[in-house]
Amino acid sequence: MADKKRYEELINILDQYSYDYYVIDNPTVEDAEYDQKMQELLKIEEAHPEWVTPDSPSKRVGGEVLEGFTKVAHDTPMLSLANAFNRDDLADFDRRIRDKVGDDIAYMCELKIDGLAVSLQYENGKYKQGATRGDGTVGEDITANLRTIRSIPMKLQKDFSIEVRGEAFMPKRSFQKLNEIREEEGQMLFANPRNAAAGSLRQLDTKIAASRNLDIFLYAVADFGEMGVTTHSEGLDMLETLGLKVNKERRLCNNLEEVYAYIDEWTEKRAELAYDIDGIVLKLNDLEQQRQMGTTVKSPRWSIAYKFPAEEVPTKLLDIELNVGRTGVITPTAVLEPVRVAGTTVSRASLHNEDLITEKDIRIGDTVLIKKAGDIIPEVIKSITEERSGSEEPFHMPKNCPTCGSELVRLEEEVALRCINPKCPAQIKEGLIHFVSRNAMNIDGLGEKVIIQLFSEHLIKDVADLFFLSKEKLLELERMGEKSVTNLLASIEASKQNSLEKLLFGLGIRHVGAKAAKSLAVHFETMDNLKMADKETLTSINDIGEKMADSIVTYFANEEVHDLLEELKRAGVNMTYTGPKLEDMSEEELVFAGKTVVLTGKLEKLTRNDAKALIESLGGNVSGSVSKKTDVVVAGSDAGSKLAKAEELAIPIWSEEDLIEYLPDEGGLN
């Protein structure tokens, strides 16, 4: 018969084993001994469920199924960091620091872990709550999922009541193993460890979170001053004495030269780490100096994140494929030997056009250097010509469309070759994908794969056919069950009520982007009015130039377009502008009337396009750069140089929450 004393002893023993293994990377027992003691603990808990506490090691394995994630307000905001992209940015940061607090300074430099920012609350030394960063003010409660991370102690070495901040992440090995399993099971692969970590921590089934082998590094306390330390470096040391996992690769630097040396070292060595990093974080070490520097609305003035330049990696160019876009443009795509770049495996990359391939002398069979532009889109930079064997083949663009066989043409003043056959299947398919996309008709459940399936099965030949799809036909398709078909048809039905600009953009009229579609919809109000417009009328509208006007007139002169619009009308698709008209709005409603607004950083609740549409609906004009002519900057998380420039120019800065206050009452934008 087990007694409670033995139960408590087992908890302490297992906690120590976990600390040795997961925090200080110095295992003191074999796995078999750990497992044996865990089994003993589980048997006691089965016999005495009333003894089980939230900090029991058994809670690490998950098992709790959550109903959802509640909101958590951060007592102290979790601010994001301004970014530096080069030494000039760092020198500007250093100058601002010295101008304010003098030259007696030091920087604590830390690796910027590429994961998910989280907050952990301890009460009297016991783990109480864990939350995501969210928008910095309000996050989500992920207490149960964070409990499954073995390197997070359930009890601190001292009975402190503190809130610590850190970065939860998925180690490279765990990521690779997870994607191998998902591939075997036919599931979609995660793009990178950061996405995998974020997805894992938002699982409602804590067993899934526990199986993902996440880890964490802690790097701050909500208020280090509460711990009786005077510097950030002392604070990190204190976290370690409490049993929390802090990254060992930090370094105290006394000047910028030492900072540069640290950055150079880890730029070279980052690939050797067991986890992904995407930069280096500098923090003014003295806490009193931090207080003097203060913070902006979004970020501390005493810290900055240096972002690594895009990683460049060599690999083999196996082939060049040609893709036909919705406007007939032929785009060459590099087929590559799979290689890991900036946290993801890349097997395809953009080659842009034939002229660029010729200019760079890129040949099939070459070893090429690739990078991710902005760490997002892979592209081929150049061929490594010194590695050629002589077997490489120069690339020649074909004279005919790879899909329909029509002769390709190069229009005046254009670099790209085009297929101008309006019945080209590839163009129709791409046009359908564009029509249902988020910025166009925004039909949930109609992704690229479903569109291709519908097109291949001859269920749709143009966009109007989407609105006449039947439940019976959809249920015959592979992987289309009752629930998904019902949801899809409901989404198609709902899209019929979209405002005119969504439909106009979705139709894919050449040269007409989302902004021009909005201008046309506001001006003409109905599709019938727009159809009758001549070039002179069109060019009198802001955003509509001669080339676009010609394209619009040509489009509506086409009899096939008339037939398509009649079919859309028959389906009940709205062809009227239903959004706000500026002349009908009061001065109070037109908060951005005549103003230039810049969006920067990552938005948490609005998409970039929704934010842009909201600003325009309030009378504003959205610009891509900050200048003296900018009236307002809306800053999300990780806002970089644009935010810094706005502060220097004393331009008013809005948060995302400030902008959301002006959303329509129904909470959405047409």
UniProtKB/Swiss-Prot annotation:
UniProt cofactor(s): Mg(2+); Mn(2+)
Cited Gene3D superfamilies: 5' to 3' exonuclease, C-terminal subdomain (1.10.150.20), 6.20.10.30, BRCT domain (3.40.50.10190), DNA ligase/mRNA capping enzyme (3.30.470.30), Helix hairpin bin (1.10.287.610), Nucleic acid-binding proteins (2.40.50.140)
Reaction(s) this enzyme catalyzes, per UniProt: NAD(+) + (deoxyribonucleotide)n-3'-hydroxyl + 5'-phospho-(deoxyribonucleotide)m = (deoxyribonucleotide)n+m + AMP + beta-nicotinamide D-nucleotide
EC top class named in words: ligase
Alphabetical UniProt keywords: DNA damage, DNA repair, DNA replication, Ligase, Magnesium, Manganese, Metal-binding, NAD, Zinc
Any one GO molecular-function label of the UniProt entry: metal ion binding
SUPFAM superfamilies in the record: BRCT domain, DNA ligase/mRNA capping enzyme, catalytic domain, Nucleic acid-binding proteins, RuvA domain 2-like
Residue ranges of domain BRCT in the record: 587-670
Top-rank taxon: Bacteria
The keyword NAD is assigned to this record: yes
A single Gene Ontology CC term: cytosol
Entry EC number(s): 6.5.1.2
GO terms for biological process, alphabetical: DNA repair; DNA replication
Keyword Zinc: yes
Active site: 112 (n6-amp-lysine intermediate)
SMART domains per record: BRCT (SM00292), HhH1 (SM00278), LIGANc (SM00532)
Binding site for NAD(+): 31-35, 80-81, 110, 133, 167, 283, 307
Positions bound to Zn(2+): 401, 404, 419, 424
Family: Belongs to the NAD-dependent DNA ligase family. LigA subfamily.
PANTHER family per the UniProt record, alphabetical: CHROMOSOME TRANSMISSION FIDELITY FACTOR 18, DNA LIGASE
Role: DNA ligase that catalyzes the formation of phosphodiester linkages between 5'-phosphoryl and 3'-hydroxyl groups in double-stranded DNA using NAD as a coenzyme and as the energy source for the reaction. It is essential for DNA replication and repair of damaged DNA.
HAMAP family documented for this protein: DNA_ligase_A
Record protein name field: DNA ligase
Species this protein is from: Listeria welshimeri serovar 6b (strain ATCC 35897 / DSM 20650 / CCUG 15529 / CIP 8149 / NCTC 11857 / SLCC 5334 / V8)
Designated gene of the protein: ligA
